[in-house]
Amino acid sequence: MNFKTSAALLSAAIAVSSCVAPGPSQQTSMAPSLSRGPAVDGRWIDRNGIISTFQNGAFSTRSTDTNTLLASGTYVTISPTLYEINMTSLVRNTQSRVNCALVSPSQLNCTTDANSQFSLTRQG
């Protein structure tokens, strides 16, 4: 359905619904909204081909070639577009904090606690 058709149908529906007053037996039901995970959930890749996965508060990074776990940790949502990752590098045996900004649905710009910057691109 194209935009013009959708807009016309929506306008018609609003016009018709404004003509009908709800009676005492009619009840307005508010359907529960489906809970979705954070916007950052999913698989992301950096410019070196390293895959990072965000899933329900858990974070992991794996190599592309051997699927070796390189880092793992947790993340929290600071705002709808800001995320804080606390992770342990299994390669360096260090802990670090990374702040990431979701600048578009397909790009995360991140800064480590050592002020290194990198970007991740959503996969698939």
From Swiss-Prot:
Signal peptide start-end: 1-18
GO cellular component: cell outer membrane
Membrane topology: Lipid-anchor
Protein name: Outer membrane lipoprotein omp10 homolog
Keywords associated with the record: Cell outer membrane, Lipoprotein, Membrane, Palmitate, Signal
InterPro entries: Omp10-like
Lipidated sites in chain (N-palmitoyl cysteine): 19
Record's subcellular location: Cell outer membrane
Family: Belongs to the rhizobiaceae omp10 lipoprotein family.
Lipidation, S-diacylglycerol cysteine type: 19
Taxonomic placement: Bacteria, Pseudomonadati, Pseudomonadota, Alphaproteobacteria, Hyphomicrobiales
